[in-house]
Amino acid sequence: MVQFFKRPLLDIVHNHLIEYPTPVNIHYFWNFGFLAFICLAVQIITGIFLAIHYTPHVDLAFYSVEHIIRDVNYGWLLRYAHANGASIFFIIIYIHISRGLYYGSYVAPRHFTWVVGVFILLLIMATAFMGYVLPWGQISLWGATVITNLVSAVPLVGNSIVTWLWGGFSVDNATLNRFFSFHYLFPFIIVAIAFVHMAFLHQKGSGNPLGLIQPVDKISMYPYFIIKDAFGLVLFLLFFSLFVYFLPNLLGHPDNYIEANPIVTPNHIVPEWYFLPFYAILRSIPHKLGGVIAIIISILILAFLPWITNINVRSSLFRPLYKKLFWILFSIVLILGWIGGKPVEMPYVVIGQLITFLYFVYFLIFIPFLGRLEKFLVNYKTVY
């Protein structure tokens, strides 16, 4: 089998998936990049078959989704695998990012790998948002109205851009068609950029829990880590199957099973759970433009982490203070997610503003200050 992949045109598989030198001490948290690619493949395959039966028209979209579930052979499986696959995809992505934060994968020489990864995250979020509009339920319509209307906060040209996005003066048929087209296109762009992400990774080599560069004991990816990835894939499929077969509607919003009605506003408009922390940041800023800027910075600030961090030690195993701060950040994000799902009323507004403030303080003050403090307290030359 190995000899087969040494042939011309297939040697890229041999070099990057079979003989690729991998640090011997990586553990299962390094499996989530592979699982993310599996999730992306599942979303693309199920999405293609769903698009065959879906009708992007405001009068037919809701019923076409019902038709897929009720009348198409295994349509229920396609729909639930795609809908729950999005949630599982974000779980995998967030764990992948958390591992990078905990073990310092964003520090040079892998900083460009990290930046490309943040760009992929932005594309995934945009794709998921447009996909959530397609079932044309109540939350689909009103969520699209609320989020796209945020662009109107841009001075001078905001309202014109919103009208252009909508294709009219409200979220309507033109909007649905545009979102469907881009939702179909974006996953293929994500695949292309994911290969760029892998190219940067393989240029410098995979990281490891110790955060060391050289010397590191390495072994070939096949068969050792391929088997490890396969075991992780089995566990992932079991977890995924739990939602698809037994809890298919657990992660959905009940109001989105009601056909979109532009006259009736839902009592509580909330995005999918994976957007809730960022939605809480948006709502915590009273000024509309300020909220838009805050939510953009809250994501882009991850891309600037390699330059905000002023210490070359990567792994939190050698940074006890940073390790504690990481779990503080983890708690901050969980609280933001909880606040994002609550109504805009006291005391949730004040709590959201406080936690949003702590989120930005963590990245803009704690991280740079901690680097200087650790340099002062510890001689890190011995780590290498």
Swiss-Prot record:
Q: Name one GO biological process term.
A: mitochondrial electron transport, ubiquinol to cytochrome c
Which residues are recorded as binding a ubiquinone?
A: H202
Bilayer-crossing regions: 32-52, 76-98, 113-133, 179-199, 225-245, 289-309, 321-341, 348-368
| Database matches in SUPFAM superfamilies | a domain/subunit of cytochrome bc1 complex (Ubiquinol-cytochrome c reductase), Transmembrane di-heme cytochromes
Q: How is the cofactor bound?
A: Binds 2 heme b groups non-covalently.
Q: Which family does it belong to?
A: Belongs to the cytochrome b family.
Output this protein's name.
Cytochrome b
The organism named in the record is Cyanidium caldarium
What are the leading ranks of the lineage? Eukaryota, Rhodophyta, Bangiophyceae, Cyanidiales, Cyanidiaceae
